[in-house]
Regions:
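Canonical leucine-rich repeat
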Residues: 51-54, 71-74, 91-94, 111-114, ...
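Conserved hydrophobic beta-strand positions in leucine-rich repeat
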Residues: 21, 41, 61-63, 81-83, ...
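N-terminal capping/linker segments that flank leucine-rich repeat
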Residues: 1-50, 58-60, 226-296
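Consensus "Asn ladder" position of solenoid repeat domains
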Residues: 46, 63-66, 86, 106, ...
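Ankyrin-repeat and related helical/solenoid repeat scaffolds used for protein-protein interactions
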Residues: 168, 173-233
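Low-complexity, intrinsically disordered segments with a bias for serine/threonine
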Residues: 6, 19, 24-28, 80-81, ...
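Leucine-rich repeat
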Residues: 90, 110, 123, 127-130, ...
Length: 296
């Protein structure tokens, strides 16, 4: 259903006691009305293709599972906005007091400036390649299933889900982090893991170097040096054993890498010397009476 002039102009009506707002549209038997109580307006799964101008006073606006491609200016009073599973290609400027933004499963290529009050940002399943600067108040960031190539500096997050992107590295992780999901990226190494981390999912990455795992890590899903590991309800002793094994693997790989490097260097040196000692370059030294042995 479209909230548009073809069905009659929508309008807002405020109750006499100022405790609720109603939106109505359509004509005759097709008229529909939705009320909001205590500043909460739920328009989920109503087939909407557009919205009328929104009045002030709305604190929580839920627009999930519609067919919206854009939103009108948002009321400055808004604290919660959920607009998942629409066709949004952009968002309007966000109110300064907004705390929760859920815009999953749209067609967003960028996000507007995030308000300093934002606590939760969920923007999974979009077309994002970058994120704006993250506010210091942010606690939960869910940005998986996008095309993000790098993350901005992270505030004191509790949960970070950046799975299924195109990340080559992660920024330093905050000490407050409890859960990290970075599955299916292009990560070759992980930064130092916070001591409070409880959940780590990092499968489907070509990780070559692992930091020590936190002692209190409870859930682990990763690919270590070609070995797939999935652990649940781990103990500090088990984590210590894994760390010991990983250090051993790392040392072995470093030694093998050193040997491969020396072998490659020997080949490169031989190829270089073949060019340097080509007859056309050697002849001038012989003519000058220079002993070639002194140059080896």
């Amino acid at each position: 259903m479209s909230v548009s002039s073809s069905e009659g102009p929508p309008w807002w009506e405020e109750s006499e006691d100022n405790t609720s707002l109603s939106i109505s549209w359509g004509r005759g038997v097709g008229t529909r009305s939705v009320s909001t109580c205590n500043g909460k307006l739920n328009l989920t799964d109503m087939g909407l293709t557009e919205l009328p101008p929104l009045p002030e006073g709305i604190l929580e606006l839920r627009l999930d599972k519609n067919h919206l491609i854009s939103l009108p200016p948002l009321p400055s009073s808004l604290l919660v906005l959920t607009c998942t599973r629409n066709h949004l290609i952009s968002l309007p400027p966000l109110p300064e007091g907004l705390r929760f933004l859920l815009c999953n499963s749209n067609q967003l290529r960028s996000l507007p400036t995030l308000p300093s009050s934002l606590q939760v940002l969920e923007c999974d399943y979009n077309l994002l390649t970058t994120l704006p600067e993250l506010p210091a108040s942010l606690e939960e960031l869910m940005c998986g299933k996008n095309r993000i190539t790098s993350l901005p500096s992270l505030p004191d997050l509790i949960e970070l889900d950046c799975a299924c992107n195109q990340l080559l590295s992660l920024p330093p992780l905050p000490a407050s982090l409890r859960s990290l999901d970075c599955v299916a990226n292009h990560l070759r190494w992980l930064p130092a893991l916070p001591e409070r981390l409880c959940v780590l999912y990092c499968k489907e990455n070509p990780i070559e170097t692992f930091p020590d795992l936190p002692r209190d890590l409870g859930y682990l899903m990763c690919d270590m040096y070609g070995i797939s590991i999935e652990l649940e309800d781990t103990t500090p002793e088990g984590i210590q054993q894994i760390n010991t094994q990983m250090r051993g693997w790392t040392e072995l790989l470093e030694q093998q890498s050193k040997e491969r490097c020396m072998a490659r260097c020997a080949i490169y040196k031989e190829q270089i010397m073949m060019v340097v000692w080509h007859p056309t370059r050697v002849a001038p030294f012989i003519e000058r009476g220079i002993d070639l042995e002194d140059m080896m």
